[in-house]
Amino acid sequence: SAGVEVDNVTVVGDSQYNDTVNGKTQFPTVADPRGTDLNQAFIQYQVREHQIKVGRQKIGLGNERFVGSVGWRQNEQTFDAVRYQTNLGDDWRFDYSLSNKVHRVFGSESAQGQWQSDLHLVDLHYKIAASSQFKFYFYSLDFQAAPLMSNQTIGVDYQHIGEFGLVQWQLFTALATQQEVGAQPMDFRANYKNIELQLTRGVFQAAFGYETLGSNNGVGFMTPLATLHKYQGFADKFLVTPSGGINDGQIKLGYKRKNWDVGVQYHWLSSAVGEINYGNELDLNVAYSFDDQYSVLLKMANYDAEQLATDTTKVW
């Protein structure tokens, strides 16, 4: 099979925001510059449990904390890559991607719109049981155009789903370590930790989590290819990890019933080293689906700065 996808971003009215290429740096950033891009163009072949995909494509690994397509942005992140996936027996799954260019959300007119790269992305999934699984991963990211973003990460995730009476619960934990690779001029070794407990009863959900992106030698643990909008608040104040790293304590509440999907979350954000209180953020989203094709979404982010950045409110 094969696929081709083109996207176009057009601004309606006056853009009172910094889209990263319009020069309006006095406004908060909304990284959706106007333009037309070839988003995907690939061929794909599958035989039994083996699948290979060649060309420009989206790559989303797991929860997209390290590699994703940044689906919230109007122009998605894609990769010129070869990707191979296969099952190794009943319990193991192998996923490897090799890429030499990243097409980022900023579009072709931006100096940061494309990164020449040498990427090796390896995921190895192991299913212990229907309710439990591990993921082992190795990501080597070498960027010629952005050497300070070059890094090599090795880590493991664990996920378990269970029930306690009428409550379904899900535990997610992750540990990783990161160091310099390729063009990176800095020597560092930073760690990553994440734990989240999610509870669901009927139409209500609650989640409690604590995530740490550590720091070493003045370099914060970085995830330049992640779907970053999903993490550390919708205001996007932490797209680049500060030199002191980040601690993110968070509470999320949700309600899903029929056509409605409502969520609220609160983040306590501070440095991983140095005891710096960055600020707090409150996020809200309300979505209504008319059918399988049409929906509306209201979304709000309010970042209350303490010792990093400035107070910011965004509404979509």
Please describe what each predicted stretch is:
Residues K24-P28, G62-V70, Q77-F79:
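Short acidic, glycine/Ser/Thr-rich loop/turn "cap" segments at secondary-structure junctions
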Residues V219-G244:
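Flexible internal linker/loop segments at domain or repeat junctions
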Residues S1-E49, D80, D90-D91, Q250-G254, ...:
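Transmembrane beta-barrel domains of Gram-negative outer membranes and organellar outer membranes
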Residues Y17-D19, P28-P33, H160, L175, ...:
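Extracellular/periplasm-exposed beta-strand and loop segments of Gram-negative cell-envelope proteins
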Residues A2, R48-I52, V70-G218, G249-I251, ...:
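Signature for the C-terminal beta-barrel architecture of outer-membrane proteins
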Residues N8-V12, K58-L61, H103:
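Solvent-exposed loop/turn segments at secondary-structure junctions
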Residues P33-S69, R73:
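Well-ordered mid-protein domain cores that form the structural environment of catalytic cofactors
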Residues D7, G55-Q57, H267:
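Short, well-ordered beta-to-alpha junction loops that form the rim of enzyme active sites
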